[in-house]
Amino acid sequence: EDDADLPKRGVDNFGFIFKEVDGEFELQKVVICEVKASESKKNPPEVVYETRDSLYKSLLELSKGSDRLMKALVKSFDRFDVNKFAALIAELAVDIEKNDALQDTKKKMMIVPFLLRTATTYSDDDFGVFYTDPSEFSGATINYYIMVVDVALSDFADDLYSSVRGES
């Protein structure tokens, strides 16, 4: 969802995993996902670590309690039953605001880099720094997904958007 103050800079996918225990809900994970696509022949492609808005840099910023994360949290209030979940999300927002290190909060974070690659450009090395040195995310869970397609990414995107719009 785009951020009105920063067009094209909202969190790509954002959500929560709750668990019900004895009729009460507990916040298990805050899921923070960024999505990139690349047909670069470089492994990993630049969008993993090198570009200004790379998966790594974007997700690291979010995991440190950036304004983008806080805005995503605030927007989430509209989507939940106030009696069940709002207090949990509010507690999380307060924890982020008052805690520079975020060590306890990071334990509840699931960081999800999602990379779209073509069959001709994909390599196991595409996991890059998320695999070789994820230490800056210490405490957080990292679930890295790479989706490989057999067509050009532009064709895949055209087909995807047509499908979403109900054109195919």
Predicted regions and their residues:
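Conserved catalytic cores of phosphodiester-cleaving nucleases, focusing on short active-site segments
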Residues: N13-G15, V31-A37
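C-terminal structured domain segments
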Residues: K106-Y145
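Short, solvent-exposed loop/turn segments that connect beta-strands within catalytic domains
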Residues: E20-Q28
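Charge-rich, low-complexity intrinsically disordered segments
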Residues: V129-S168
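Generalized protein targeting/export and membrane-interface segments
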Residues: Q28, E34, K41-N43
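Conserved nucleotide-binding/hydrolysis micro-motifs of P-loop NTPases
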Residues: E20, A37-S40
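Acidic, metal/cofactor-coordinating or nucleic-acid-engaging core segments within structured domains
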Residues: K41-V112
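Short N-terminal edge-element motif at the start of the domain
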Residues: E1-K8
